[in-house]
Amino acid sequence: MIDSKTVLLGLIGHPVEHSFSPIMHNAAINDLKINYVYLGFDISNENLKNVVNSAKTLSILGFNVTIPYKVEIMKYLDKIDDTAKFIGAVNTVKIENGEAVGYNTDGIGAKKSLEEEIGKFNNKNILMIGSGGSSRSISFELAKENEITIINRNIKNAKELSFEISKNLATKEYGEKYLKYGDLSTDISKFDIIINTTPVGMYPDVNSKPVIPLKNAKNDAIIMDIIYNPFEPVFLKEAKKYGLKTLNGLGMLIYQGAVSFEIWTGFKPDTNVMKNSIVNLLKS
């Protein structure tokens, strides 16, 4: 029951009406029987600068940050933890002793989701589609034990991210790795895992997909899309058409959310409860 002592958590982004985050976080809250509530806030770009001070004023404990503000939010924070600073993007903010502190849990969320599907992995050749905040966090996490190639419509952004990965995290000297879209017709067959980190195909633009020649992908490639609404984006439908194994963004959402939840509350949520809340919603 919400009362004057209820602690407020939330999600900021634009849009947010598609998000399952409130569903799964409130399910975890109810399961733990703690007096919290998690709400979604659709924030326009011009109002982003007011979010942090508003959270402090309203005694909001913390919030997730989603597309398109994971990078821009950083300039309004008081502190940023080393991992998020290294990545250059924030998806979790906690108000600690009057200061807004930024974290990033996306990378570990994506890794845990992949591990749930295929087990522990390393030395994989991975193609990352996109170079935004989500791509940065996932790339830096996976580059610790794998080889990452970036593809993006803006080749300059792809090159910059690839350079940062090569300079800071590569476990072996393989140099910068990035591609133009035109290169994929021949190069795509070398990738073990292909991950779409862009919002292309996300609700409400559900009929769009990245222009990637999946018909040329290797037979045992894993095709992941971090989108979870729709549950099966067009990109994954196409992958299935070619007999490829697919993974949507639900697992990543749950695992990154569980880490965020623990940062805010100190409680470890039951990820099965979080997952079932979304699965039951989709079934209904």
Curated annotation (Swiss-Prot):
InterPro entries: Aminoacid_DH-like_N_sf, NAD(P)-bd_dom_sf, SDH_C, Shikimate_DH, Shikimate_DH-bd_N, Shikimate_DH_fam, Shikm_DH/Glu-tRNA_Rdtase. The keyword NADP applies. GO terms for biological process: amino acid biosynthetic process; aromatic amino acid family biosynthetic process; chorismate biosynthetic process; shikimate metabolic process. Keywords: Amino-acid biosynthesis, Aromatic amino acid biosynthesis, NADP, Oxidoreductase. The active site is at K70 (proton acceptor). NADP(+) binds at D82, G130, S131, G132, G133, S134, I226, G249. Shikimate binds at S19, F20, S21, T66, N91, D106, Y228. One of its GO terms (molecular function) is NADP binding. Pathway: Metabolic intermediate biosynthesis; chorismate biosynthesis; chorismate from D-erythrose 4-phosphate and phosphoenolpyruvate: step 4/7. Pfam families: SDH_C (PF18317), Shikimate_DH (PF01488), Shikimate_dh_N (PF08501). It catalyses: shikimate + NADP(+) = 3-dehydroshikimate + NADPH + H(+). Homodimer. Involved in the biosynthesis of the chorismate, which leads to the biosynthesis of aromatic amino acids. Catalyzes the reversible NADPH linked reduction of 3-dehydroshikimate (DHSA) to yield shikimate (SA). Belongs to the shikimate dehydrogenase family. This is Shikimate dehydrogenase (NADP(+)).
